[in-house]
């Protein structure tokens, strides 16, 4: 889905080697304020090495995202997954 008017962080190192990436963005689709380019730019991931379930969203600064059904669905699904009791047993 398209994300308009949001802030994109640039990493010095790609986090992909340490996490399980759920979504990424095409760096050619936006303009950065830095010369650092990763090519593959993860924006949503989980980190299975942690004890607690976690989902990291690199974007979500714009309130417009909460009007986007695809983003809302992904956000709700991530909350449901992190809060599931049956995964603790």
Residue ranges with predicted function:
Residues 24-26, 57-61:
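Active-site-proximal beta-strand/loop segments in catalytic clefts of secreted hydrolases
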Residues 29, 62, 86:
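Surface-exposed, flexible loop/turn segments at secondary-structure boundaries
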Residues 61-68:
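Active-site rim elements
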Residues 1-51:
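Catalytic beta-strand/loop cores that center a nucleophilic Ser/Cys/Thr
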Residues 52, 86-89:
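Long alpha-helical segments found as membrane-embedded helices
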Residues 77-85:
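C-terminal alpha-helix
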Residues 70-77:
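Extracytoplasmic/secreted proteins, especially bacterial periplasmic and envelope-associated proteins
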């Amino acid at each position: 889905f398209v994300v308009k008017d949001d802030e994109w962080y640039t990493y010095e190192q790609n986090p992909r080697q340490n996490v399980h990436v759920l979504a990424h963005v095409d760096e050619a689709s936006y303009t950065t304020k830095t010369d650092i380019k990763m090519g593959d730019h993860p924006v949503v991931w989980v980190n299975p090495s942690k004890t607690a379930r976690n989902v990291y969203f690199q974007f979500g600064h714009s309130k417009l995202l909460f009007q986007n059904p695809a983003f809302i669905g992904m956000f709700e699904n991530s909350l449901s997954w992190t809060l599931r009791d049956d995964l603790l047993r």
